[in-house]
């Protein structure tokens, strides 16, 4: 049995209107029917573009957001139905590392106070001295010195603050840690350090991770299984290597085509899938398949009317698409432009293709006149070159004559003036 299992989880936020008497006029369907399972000791990566509901789903697992419908089963217990007092005990075993390390740390508390607060709330450690000793041990595991306990969050770098956030989760000895964009706010060099730290802690402590991210390279490096979310739903799930080797959902294909390839020759040859339009509003999602408004392979049947279930297509690879097999076999053709056509338009690209084909078909090149044109050009150039100095000499002589006349006039005036 899985350590953490989600079954049809929905998180809908009501949209209210009115000054005195609030009335619900609609809902934001942030998470709309997500089912997944995470095995003990496994890392499950959840990816998708901004606004697809990844963070909301992670917070719903911890009951930081109320669950509208569905079940969150942790170690055999449905957390969605637990009273608040009973849920308190499970929160120690489920911890979260937040996206913004500075915003999640109290600026008025030093590090020892921040880490000891959770321990005291859950009764970990007999007294302050024992808790202090455990905090020193945890800080050493995340690569921070013991003198960090007396310092405040603003005195640390971004990477160090994220390590403090990880330490805060570890002091409670959790079974599952939900990492919400753990490295998105950090430099690339620091990202590698934090990812390696998470892997080392998983090996030494037997932790289970649910990693939420939009960086596909980070998710591939750390995850065993990857789920792809789009507009509140899971559209594809597969083992990490299988997903990157052969994505099957049109949305996943578009995501993977956006990942740059270091080899320039491969980068130039591979297909680039550009999607039309923006992510639809979760307050008014499309009917049928959520992705059909942007899908390059959209069909007139089913796509706009029936929402596809997430089905296993073999080897643990699950896809939510009506035409997965047909797209893979090539029997369903693209109905929307995807490459440069999506930017310049299909008519422009078609016209350029016709011109190229006509050029390659081989109209005879015009015969050039033999050497007469260059000879004429040389003669013209020589004539112009000779004319320029002659014209310059004439202008110089005119200016000299004018200057001589002015001097003569001035002399006559001087000689003809009154004598002393």
Predicted regions, residues:
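Conserved ABC transporter NBD signature motif
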Residues: 70-78
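Conserved ABC ATPase "signature" region
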Residues: 77-78, 129-147, 256-257
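Conserved ABC ATPase signature
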Residues: 152-156, 160
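P-loop NTP-binding/switch modules centered on Walker-like glycine-rich loops
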Residues: 176-178, 182-186, 190-268
């Amino acid at each position: 049995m899985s350590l953490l299992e989600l079954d049809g989880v929905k998180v809908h936020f009501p949209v209210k209107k009115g000054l005195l008497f609030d009335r619900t006029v609609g809902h934001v369907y942030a998470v709309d029917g997500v089912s997944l399972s995470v095995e003990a000791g496994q890392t499950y990566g959840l990816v998708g573009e901004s606004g697809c509901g990844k963070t909301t789903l992670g917070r719903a697992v911890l009951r930081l957001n109320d669950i509208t419908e569905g079940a969150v089963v942790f170690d055999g217990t449905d957390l969605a139905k637990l009273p608040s007092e009973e849920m308190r005990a499970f929160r120690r075993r489920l911890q979260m590392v937040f996206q913004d390390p500075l915003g999640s740390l109290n600026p008025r508390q030093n590090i020892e106070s921040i880490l000891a607060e959770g321990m005291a709330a859950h009764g970990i450690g007999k007294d302050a001295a024992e808790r202090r000793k455990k905090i020193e041990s945890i800080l050493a595991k995340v690569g921070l010195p013991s003198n960090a306990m007396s310092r405040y969050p603003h005195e640390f770098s971004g990477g160090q603050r994220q390590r403090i956030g990880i330490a805060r989760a570890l002091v409670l000895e959790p079974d599952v840690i939900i990492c919400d964009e753990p490295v998105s706010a950090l430099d690339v060099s620091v990202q590698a350090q934090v990812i390696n730290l998470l892997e080392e802690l998983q090996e030494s402590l037997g932790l289970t991770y649910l990693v939420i991210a939009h960086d596909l390279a980070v998710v591939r490096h750390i995850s065993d299984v990857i789920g792809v979310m789009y507009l509140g739903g899971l559209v594809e799930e597969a083992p990490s290597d299988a997903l990157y080797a052969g994505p099957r959902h049109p949305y996943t294909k578009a995501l993977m085509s956006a990942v740059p390839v270091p080899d320039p020759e491969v980068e130039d040859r591979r297909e680039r899938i550009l999607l039309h339009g923006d992510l639809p509003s979760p307050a008014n999602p499309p009917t049928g398949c959520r992705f059909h408004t942007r899908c390059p392979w959209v069909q007139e049947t089913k796509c706009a009317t029936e929402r596809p279930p997430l089905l296993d297509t073999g080897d643990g690879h699950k896809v939510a698409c009506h035409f997965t097999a047909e797209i893979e076999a090539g029997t369903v053709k693209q109905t929307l432009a995807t490459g440069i056509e999506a930017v310049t338009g299909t008519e422009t690209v078609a016209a350029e293709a016709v011109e190229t084909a006509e050029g390659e078909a081989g109209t005879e090149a015009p015969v050039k006149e033999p050497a007469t044109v260059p000879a004429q050009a040389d003669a013209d150039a020589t004539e112009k070159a000779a004319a320029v100095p002659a014209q310059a000499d004439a202008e110089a002589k005119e200016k000299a004559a004018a200057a001589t006349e002015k001097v003569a006039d001035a002399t006559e005036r001087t000689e003809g003036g009154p004598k002393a």
